[in-house]
A protein has these predicted regions:
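Phosphate-binding glycine-rich loops and their immediate beta-loop-alpha structural context
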Residues: 142, 146-149
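The feature marks the mature, well-folded catalytic cores of soluble enzymes
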Residues: 1-134
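Ferredoxin-type iron-sulfur electron-transfer modules in oxidoreductases and energy-metabolism complexes
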Residues: 110-139, 154-262
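Short alpha-helical basic/polar micro-motif
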Residues: 41, 150, 200
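Secondary-structure junction/capping motif
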Residues: 9-10, 76, 95, 101, ...
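Short linear elements at protein peripheries
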Residues: 253-289
Length: 289
């Protein structure tokens, strides 16, 4: 697609791509960046990065558009002394990221660099729904470091694309039902072992596993589940409470039934886990004999 010569080494491919992208930055009329923090006292946006692409986006184009959620406001620029290292340490294990920039507007008449125009777009997209909920409000403390994703056993196994949402991992499972609808995304709150590892590593002390339970409770009270789902879980409960029913069939039949019932809801991104040929109870009885 880019007409790269065949047989290039990884380093050569990097240089080849860099030349193409650098020209695109130079020719662009508009540069769009995200925002890590909004600074209320000086009316500025703070961006932290390791590659320097955000600086390129704001240096060459005539117009800089910064897009951010409304929850990223810090009271003072002095708070960056805490939050920039906090984000770097929990996000990538660094003391501080390589490039840290504060943008306070378009360039003045006597300045020679920076964009001629700057626009900041504040996104709500359901965030006020979260802020209105006293219990769920603490999820808006998130600084997007990704620490909860790195320790989550579910995220490690299914990956980010399986969530089919803007935000994945534990924090995504907490906030997505508010941002995109509880009925459509209630299942994300069940994609958790409730081990609490996400809560332990969160730098801003969000009780993520408790908020996942809270979302589950809300979905039940809102009657978001279908009738077939309720019947299915009732049968599952009866089977799990009966040792005779648990030992009734072997692993092969259980695998067939689970794939038949849950293949569609499980999705195509991951294969269903297999049952062991014998249950632990059966193996224990065989050992006792």
């Amino acid at each position: 697609k880019l007409n790269a010569p065949p047989g290039l080494a990884p380093e050569e491919l990097t240089l080849f791509t860099r030349q193409i992208l650098r020209q695109k930055y130079v020719d662009a009329d508009i540069g769009i960046t995200g925002v890590n923090f909004l600074l209320a006292d000086i009316g500025a946006v703070a961006v932290t990065e390791n590659e320097g692409n955000a600086r390129l986006c704001t240096s060459f184009p005539k117009t800089h558009i910064a897009i951010t959620g409304i929850e990223k406001i810090l009271p003072s620029v002095n708070d960056l002394a805490l939050f920039w290292p906090l984000l770097a340490t929990h996000g990538s294990g660094q003391h501080i990221t390589v490039y840290n920039t504060i943008f306070s507007g378009a360039r003045k008449e006597n300045e020679i660099d920076g964009p001629e125009d700057m626009y900041v777009i504040l996104l709500d997209n359901g965030r006020t729904n979260i802020l209105a909920d006293v219990t769920a409000r603490e999820s808006m403390f998130c600084i997007r470091c990704g620490a909860c994703l790195n320790v989550c056993p579910v995220f490690k196994n299914i990956g980010g694309h399986t969530y089919k949402a803007t935000y994945g991992g534990p924090i995504g499972s907490v906030i997505t039902p508010y941002l995109s609808g509880l009925k459509s995304y209630k299942h994300l709150s069940y994609a958790s072992s409730l081990c609490g590892a996400c809560t332990q590593v969160c730098p801003v002390h969000i009780n993520l596993h408790e908020l996942l339970l809270y979302n589950r409770n809300k979905s039940v009270k809102a009657h978001c589940g279908s009738r077939s789902e309720k019947i299915g879980w009732l049968l599952w409960k009866k089977a799990c409470l009966s040792r005779a029913m648990m030992n009734m069939t072997n692993g092969r039949i259980k695998n067939f039934m689970i794939k038949l019932l849950f293949r569609k809801s499980w999705g195509d991104n991951r294969s269903l886990p297999d049952f062991a040929p014998k249950t632990f109870n059966e193996l224990w009885k065989a050992t006792e004999q």
